[in-house]
Amino acid sequence: MTQPASSRVVFDPSNPTTFSVEAIAAYTPVALIRLLNASGPLQPGHRVDIADARSIYTVGAAASAARARANHNANTIRRTAMFAETDPMTWLRPTVGLKRTFNPRIIRPQPPNPSMSLGISGPTILPQKTQSADQSALQQPAALAFSGSSPQHPPPQTTSASVGQQQHVVSGSSGQQPQQGAQSSTVQPTTGSPPAAQGVPQSTPPPTQNTPQGGKGQTLSHTGQSGNASRSRRV
């Protein structure tokens, strides 16, 4: 009886525990036939011939090949799983790698950047200068508009002239001529004529008017003075 050198278990037809694909396939068909016939028929009244041995061998070889493929696939899967378990990129990437790079809870001190500091300090100073310049530019037209719209707050450079002309207007409307000292201290208008009392004819008529002496001339002179006063206030 020939023993297969590559079989791990010796095939014994009388012992079912030794039935294995590798042990049966390790025998040649002739050796298998001799082994089966020597140990007795597996079925009563039936002897194993070459056809049975060939079928057994073919089935054994196919089963052995299938078992080898299964083992190969299992070993491949096992090796892949072991490689995945022992691969440092598989285990360290979600733990050390992510903690080292993407964990927001870890706050690291960063050195100060001079360009960022200059960029931050620059805009804090410039808007103050531009704001003061804008305020000064806006205050001047506002003061001019305010002084031109309301006669109660005239600009400082036209205070004396406007006050003197207001005195002329008040004295002309009331019928009394202003005093000589007040006329000398104030600025006389350039286009109008000195006021005259109501009911008293003027000695010299205005050079620009051809109307006779009377109320119309007085009214025109008063309106001219008031117009000069309004012009002085608008300046």
UniProtKB/Swiss-Prot annotation:
GO cellular component annotations of the record: host cell nucleus; viral capsid
Q: Which BP terms in the Gene Ontology apply to this protein?
A: viral process
List the InterPro entries: Herpes_UL35 (IPR007584)
The record's region (Disordered) falls at 104-235
UniProt key word Ion transport: no
Q: Bias category Low complexity: which stretches? A: 158-188
Question: What keywords would UniProt list here?
Answer: Capsid protein, Host nucleus, Virion
How does this chain assemble? Interacts with the major capsid protein/MCP.
Q: Which family does it belong to?
A: Belongs to the herpesviridae small capsomere-interacting protein family.
Question: What is the name of the protein in this document?
Answer: Small capsomere-interacting protein
User: What gene name is given for the protein in this entry?
Assistant: SCP
